[in-house]
């Protein structure tokens, strides 16, 4: 369950049931209906509509129906990330002020959703373990934090309800422009250029010392950017992009996501250890810290067993071949 803060400031349990969100309601990761030779401005309009509109819908669900499923806030964070990535992918076509305002708004939504989602993930890990009863005092405190995290989500929704977010999306899409020197640019040309940049940054980050958690996190970020770019640019290329390249990058993201979950938990636990005063919670936090640190080591080892220099080299060559990118530009 989640605690909702009442008007008198008290936390009261919400009827939190883990009902799955129907797949039909979830936004597709792919942007269908695009053709390689279509003008990039048309591709941009369709892509940004498809990426931005779901944010408003998930925000409403995360605000009004959080007690029904943690999936709503999860989908809000995912849709916001995808929207920000698509906006960045077509940034040169968006008027500067529109771009800055929408990016700022999406950043606020993502931050709110991220805080709430972190609580949900950590709470689930505590309560789904075999010794859930042992962690109950800590889980209860996490629920209180989750209640606090719900308030900014609801506040943003109140500000944007009544079609206000959709109106912002329509205004932004309507203002999309193609600079004169880009008038003849096709979707595939734009996509190839954009992906070349993402691929380069991904492998550059992958060539760093990935034994360092900070550098490993940066590699994860670049991998996420590349994965989202593959999703909104995939229609410009053959099926190999969806079926092969995206699958490889997604696998890397899955393994790095596990690493990040444990690293994030350690960061939160350390902060709570410094802020909370209850001895009982201190003991649980110390115990959990040791557990998360061991799990982080295991997760890093699992990633490094999979992400080998040979795999990186082979993947780079496949990108160069399928996307017709010059291989030397992406050498580690």
Regions found by a protein language model. Name each.
Residues 5, 11-332:
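Function-determining surface determinants
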């Amino acid at each position: 369950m989640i605690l909702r803060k009442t008007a008198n400031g008290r936390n009261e349990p919400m009827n939190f049931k883990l009902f799955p969100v129907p797949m039909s309601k979830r936004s597709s990761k792919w942007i269908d209906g695009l053709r390689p030779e279509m003008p990039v401005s048309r591709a941009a309009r369709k892509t940004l509509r498809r990426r931005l509109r779901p944010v408003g819908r998930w925000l409403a669900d995360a605000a009004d129906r959080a007690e029904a499923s943690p999936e709503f806030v999860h989908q809000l964070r995912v849709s916001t990330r995808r929207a920000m990535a698509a906006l960045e992918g077509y940034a040169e076509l968006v008027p500067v002020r529109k771009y800055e305002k929408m990016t700022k708004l999406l950043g606020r939504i993502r931050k709110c959703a991220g805080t709430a989602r972190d609580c949900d993930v950590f709470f689930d890990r505590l309560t789904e373990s075999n010794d859930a009863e042992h962690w109950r005092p800590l889980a209860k405190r996490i629920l209180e934090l989750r209640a606090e995290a719900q308030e900014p989500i609801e506040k943003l929704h109140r500000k944007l309800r009544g079609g206000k977010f959709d109106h912002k999306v329509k205004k932004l899409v309507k203002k999309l422009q193609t600079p004169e020197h880009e008038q003849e640019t096709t979707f595939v040309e734009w996509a190839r250029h954009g992906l070349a940049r993402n691929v380069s940054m991904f492998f550059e980050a992958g060539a760093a010392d990935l034994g360092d958690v900070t550098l490993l996190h940066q590699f994860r970020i670049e991998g996420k950017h590349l994965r989202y770019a593959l999703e909104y640019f995939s229609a410009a290329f053959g099926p190999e992009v969806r079926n092969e390249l995206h699958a490889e990058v997604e696998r890397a993201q899955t393994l790095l996501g596990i690493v990040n979950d444990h690293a994030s938990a350690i960061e939160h636990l350390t902060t709570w250890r410094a802020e909370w005063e209850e001895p009982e919670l201190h003991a649980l936090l110390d115990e959990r810290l040791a557990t998360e640190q061991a799990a982080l080591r295991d997760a890093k080892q699992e990633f490094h067993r999979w992400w080998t220099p040979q795999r990186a080299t082979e993947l780079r060559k496949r990108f160069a071949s399928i996307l017709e990118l010059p291989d030397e530009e992406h050498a580690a």
